[in-house]
């Protein structure tokens, strides 16, 4: 038993982890089993807009589903796949129509598809918001960690142009103002020069991948950084897994496997996007200083002005024990969005929660989700959502 456990542990420590599946075949809504089918509605070179379409034979439940708010969840592009938010998606599906940004592994994107910049990220988000609005007549946006910054930029630019805005924004555990309560992640970016990152962590994709020759920040480096933040915790977890295998505790061992199958699956990021994020967010603090310019899809240079946002609810969420995005970093969005009335802004600190606890696990489901759901519903029911352009029939879209 001990020998078998040793082989199993060594295999898992050395294996190559592939992109996980969301694996949400159905959810229970009001006692009815609602089937889920993943559909790619917008296919971009570096990201798919994934829609979790719902299907149900129960007429009453179907009517309920049709009336639910449509939410675009913007997943982080910071090393892990969007499936890291599996629990977020599964919970949100109980009361919302759910879309998510499914970011692609840059090593699989051919050079012929061009580069990917932080500006492109912002433009992608705007395109996805418009798509959801065109489909449902409205959109709510929820961003988790890294994307809080480009999402705020995207909505700010839409506001400055006078576009139809999302009805609400929920921003969770993100570095809106990385100068507040700096964490180890912030300090690394602030204490190293831009050229250090360019010269030490950027590599070209090997020839055996579709993206051969592309400059990337490799996922394995990001994963090493994740583990280095809490080495004792990961070491103990692997040792506990080894003991569970010896004892024959298959349930605990399987929980370990599921977590690390997700945690160890990482993607490469395009070098331009990664380096520009380091400079813009963690070194120059352009968002909070009001000096961030974005090149639009049409080639125009536009200044990011969060103060131009007015007709949009804003909820910020922080974990009390978050060691990635420090206290006050996400809450800073409330001050930046000075054009939003105080009555439409709210902040929630999750007691006892670390970074991952605000979007996954018991605290997310029992503490955070009720706050998010109530905020979205409050701004959904009070707004006059435009009617969908396409008729909704057997599917809830």
Residue ranges with predicted function:
Residues 348-366:
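Catalytic histidine-centered segment of alpha/beta-hydrolase-like enzymes
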Residues 21, 25-28, 32-109:
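Short, surface-exposed "cap/lid" segments of acyl-processing enzymes
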Residues 142-148, 319:
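Conserved alpha/beta-hydrolase "nucleophile elbow" surrounding the catalytic nucleophile
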Residues 108-112, 122-139, 151-156:
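Conserved acidic catalytic loop of the alpha/beta-hydrolase fold
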Residues 1-9, 136-137, 154-272:
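Alpha/beta-hydrolase-fold enzymes
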Residues 323-329:
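Conserved alpha/beta-hydrolase "acid-adjacent" motif
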Residues 309-310, 316-318, 322:
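Short beta-strand/loop motif that positions the catalytic acidic residue
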Residues 1-31, 63, 395-397:
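N-terminal targeting or regulatory segments adjacent to alpha/beta-hydrolase or S9 domains
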């Amino acid at each position: 038993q001990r020998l078998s456990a040793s082989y199993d542990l060594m295999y898992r420590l050395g294996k190559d982890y592939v992109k996980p599946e969301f694996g949400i075949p159905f959810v229970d809504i009001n006692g009815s089993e609602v089937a889920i089918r993943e559909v790619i509605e917008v296919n971009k070179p570096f990201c798919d807009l994934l829609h979790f379409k719902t299907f149900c034979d129960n007429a009453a439940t179907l009517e309920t589903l049709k009336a639910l708010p449509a939410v675009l969840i913007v997943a982080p592009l910071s090393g892990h796949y969007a499936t890291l938010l599996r629990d977020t998606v599964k919970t949100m599906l109980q009361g919302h129509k759910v879309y998510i940004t499914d970011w692609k592994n840059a090593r699989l994107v051919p050079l012929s598809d061009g580069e990917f910049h932080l500006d492109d990220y912002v433009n992608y988000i705007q395109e996805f918001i418009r798509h959801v609005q065109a489909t449902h007549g409205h959109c709510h946006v929820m961003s988790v960690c890294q994307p809080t910054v480009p999402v705020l930029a995207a909505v700010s630019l839409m506001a400055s142009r006078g576009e139809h805005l999302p009805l609400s924004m929920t921003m969770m555990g993100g570095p809106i103002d990385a100068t507040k309560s700096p964490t180890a992640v912030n300090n690394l970016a602030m204490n190293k020069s831009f050229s250090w990152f360019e010269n030490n962590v950027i590599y070209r994709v090997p020839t055996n991948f579709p993206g051969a020759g592309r400059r990337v920040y490799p996922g394995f480096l990001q994963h090493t950084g994740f583990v280095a933040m809490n080495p004792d915790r990961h070491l103990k977890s692997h040792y506990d897994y080894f003991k569970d295998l010896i004892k024959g505790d298959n349930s605990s061992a399987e929980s370990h496997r599921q977590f690390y199958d997700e945690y160890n699956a990482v993607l490469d990021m395009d070098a331009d996007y990664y380096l520009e994020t380091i400079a813009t967010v963690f070194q120059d603090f352009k968002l909070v200083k009001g000096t961030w310019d974005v090149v639009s899809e049409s080639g125009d240079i536009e200044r990011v002005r969060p103060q131009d946002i007015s007709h949009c609810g804003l909820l910020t969420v922080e974990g009390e024990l978050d060691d990635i995005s420090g206290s006050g970093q996400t809450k800073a969005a409330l001050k930046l969005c000075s054009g939003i009335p105080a009555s439409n802004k709210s902040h929630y600190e999750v007691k006892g929660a670390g970074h991952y606890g605000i979007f996954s696990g018991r605290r997310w489901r029992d503490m955070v989700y009720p706050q998010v759901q109530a905020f979205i519903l409050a701004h959904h029911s009070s707004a006059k959502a435009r009617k969908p352009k396409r008729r909704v029939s057997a599917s809830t879209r």
